[in-house]
Swiss-Prot record:
Catalyzed reaction equations: tRNA(Asp) + L-aspartate + ATP = L-aspartyl-tRNA(Asp) + AMP + diphosphate
Subcellular location(s) of the protein: Cytoplasm
Protein name, per record: Aspartate--tRNA ligase
Job of this protein: Catalyzes the attachment of L-aspartate to tRNA(Asp) in a two-step reaction: L-aspartate is first activated by ATP to form Asp-AMP and then transferred to the acceptor end of tRNA(Asp).
Similarity section: Belongs to the class-II aminoacyl-tRNA synthetase family. Type 1 subfamily.
SUBUNIT field: Homodimer.
Record flagged with keyword NADP: no
Entry's Gene Ontology cellular component terms: cytoplasm
GO BP of this protein: aspartyl-tRNA aminoacylation
Length: 597
């Protein structure tokens, strides 16, 4: 039905007759000539109909937005004065010779103009229309190019594309599982996989030493701009490769993607330890485009007569750190109060500040509500430590170390945006040497990555003796403050795996019930293995500049995990529930506060 895509027509086709199909993006009658913008997934081309062909002209005059049509015409060059540099096809136009309406369109429920706002609900309800918009179509086409490039790279490096089960067993991986009731085994449930983690390890044990899969994963968790209940991973696992080798190979893949698809040379990725990232940036996924860093000043303020500072400064678990913001002294008191309110979201109790209005005036040039607690020597030491100049602003975080890191790390990002401090377009890095475990709110231990991550150079006995001091052989790839992917060397010894389970409070009986198949498999010559999983949706979001992963997925869910297009989730009918042995129990209404007094 067509000879070319609309967006592919160019000057090399001048003088040729082409057949195109697509949708009417816009139609207008200017001085007795009909100009038609015809759109398909590759772009838009202008078609011109004039009255010299009255039958075709009359049909063209009836066209409206989103009519699906076929046109035949002659490619001709536009006059220089009419060239549109904003269009790929802007040097040419089609003189329409024939026109067939393949289907008309009802009045549109959403606005197709990119400059007009549609609600998220409208866009998802009429996603098939939303996806016709060029910016959305471009992202979906770009996504296909990324997955194609990934497959070419991995296939070319000896990786095998192997599918793993979607109906599997629930395992504790951090988020809630989506459960699927079994009709055959009443009262029992499959779980949709949060990742193929255990199956890809089993593939290593099976001798398939290089595996990959572009795979759907499912997590029933609260959603954010970069989270969806179902998402796609580029899942990779290897045997007989060290963590350094896995990092080198996957870095090569990502650098190749950016070079091929964006013509961007990312260069060699620097490496940074988890401890350094948290100390300098308050985050284990630092955005290195932002020049601001957290600067420790506990040693300077530990003797001041101000409990907000000297308390954390003298607490082994406390921290006092500052941000020095160039030009920040211009902020009003109201704006500073907004910053103080912002850090409370992250657990901070408040935010002290110091304006350097005029460095030459000494203490007279310093403005701060806590200045009365600070001697001139302390102020001078702070100025020297931070390198603050006239017009700068110093912001203080003082609390438990984890709260200071989280609150000041978040404030660092906000200030970087507010003051337009971001430098460069792409800043990748590897974050390595993560703690194996972290404390939970109830004092227990939680695996920072997952319970199958191997420690660096420790025996099971050493690990159980000092779990909180253990460093994992794990690595995260970070770009512009987003985690692109994370991985680790895996445990390949049953004794070490059992030790990790015990540290996490999983006794031998529970471990046998939930992971017995893994512990058994580890007994039969399991090779050393390591891997990594990338969030494909997040990679596409960054590469296309989209604001949400919903804008790079064909049919995403809302932030409440619903699909307005199909009205999913929906109720099952009683017959289906009976076959599954499932009954629906109405949730009990929450007790009124007065009823509990």
């Amino acid at each position: 039905m067509r000879s070319h895509y609309c967006g592919d027509v160019n000057k090399s086709h001048v003088g040729q007759e082409v057949t195109l199909v697509g949708w009417v993006n816009r139609s207008r009658d200017l001085g007795g000539v009909v100009f038609l913008d015809l759109r398909d997934r590759e772009g838009i081309v202008q078609v011109v109909y004039d009255p010299d062909l009255p039958e075709v002209f009359d049909v063209a005059s009836t066209l409206r937005s989103e009519f699906c049509v076929q046109i035949k015409g002659l490619v001709r060059a536009r006059p220089d004065s009419q060239i549109n540099a904003d269009m790929r096809t802007g040097e040419v136009e089609i003189l329409g010779l024939e026109l067939t309406i393949l289907n008309s369109s009802a009045p549109l429920p959403i606005n197709m103009d990119k400059n007009q706002h549609n609600t998220e609900e409208q866009r998802l309800k009429y996603r098939y229309l939303d996806l016709r918009r060029p910016e959305m179509a471009d992202r979906i086409v770009f996504r296909s190019k990324v997955t194609s490039a990934v497959r070419r790279f991995l296939d070319g490096n000896g990786f095998l594309d192997i599918e793993t089960p979607i109906l599997t067993k629930a395992t504790p991986e951090g988020a809630r599982d989506y459960l699927v009731p079994s009709r055959t085994y009443k009262g029992q449930f499959f779980a949709l996989p949060q990742s193929p983690q255990l199956f890809k390890q089993l593939l290593m044990m099976s001798g398939f030493d290089r595996y990959y899969q572009i795979v759907k994963c499912f997590r029933d968790e609260d959603l954010r701009a970069d989270r969806q209940p179902e998402f796609t991973q580029i899942d990779i696992e290897t045997s007989f490769m060290t963590s350094a080798q896995v990092m080198d190979k996957t870095e090569e893949m990502v650098r190749g993607l950016f070079k091929e698809l964006l013509n961007v040379d990312l260069g060699e990725f620097p490496k940074m330890t988890f401890e350094e990232a948290m100390r300098r940036f308050g985050s284990d996924k630092p955005d290195l485009r932002n020049p601001l860093e957290l600067i420790d000043v506990a040693d300077i303020v530990k003797e001041v007569e101000f409990a907000v500072f000297n308390g954390p400064a003298n607490d082994p678990e406390g921290r006092v750190a500052v941000l020095s913001i160039p030009g920040g002294a211009k902020l009003s008191r109201k704006q500073l109060d907004e910053y103080a309110k912002y850090v409370t979201i992250y657990g901070a109790k408040g935010l002290a500040w110091m304006k350097v209005n005029d460095l030459a005036q000494g203490m007279e040039g310093i403005q701060s509500p806590v200045l009365k607690f600070l001697s001139e020597d302390v102020v001078n030491a702070l100025l020297e430590r931070t390198g603050a100049q006239t017009g700068d602003l110093i912001l203080f975080g003082a609390d438990k170390a984890n709260i200071v890191a989280e609150a000041m790390g978040a404030l660092r990002l906000k200030a970087g945006e507010d003051f337009d401090l971001l430098q460069g377009e792409w800043k990748p890095l590897w974050v390595v040497d993560f703690p194996m475990f972290e404390r939970t709110s109830d004092g227990g231990l939680h695996a920072m990555h997952h319970p199958f991550t191997a420690p660096s150079n420790m025996t099971p006995e050493e690990l159980e003796a000092n779990p909180i001091g253990a460093i994992s052989d794990a690595y995260d790839m970070v770009l512009n403050g987003c985690e692109l992917g994370g991985g680790s060397v895996r445990i390949h010894d049953s004794k070490m795996q059992s030790a990790v389970f015990r540290i996490l409070g999983i006794n031998d009986e529970e471990a046998s019930e939930k992971f017995g198949f893994l512990l058994e498999a580890l007994r039969y010559g399991t090779p050393p293995h390591a891997g990594l999983a990338f969030g494909l949706d997040r990679i596409i979001m960054l590469m296309t500049g989209a604001s949400s992963i919903r804008d790079v997925m064909a049919f995403p869910k809302t932030t409440t995990a619903a699909c307005p297009l199909t009205n999913a989730p929906g109720f099952a009918n009683p017959v289906q529930l009976a076959e599954l042995g499932v009954s629906v129990v109405e949730a009990e209404p929450k007790a009124d506060a007065k009823d509990t007094e």
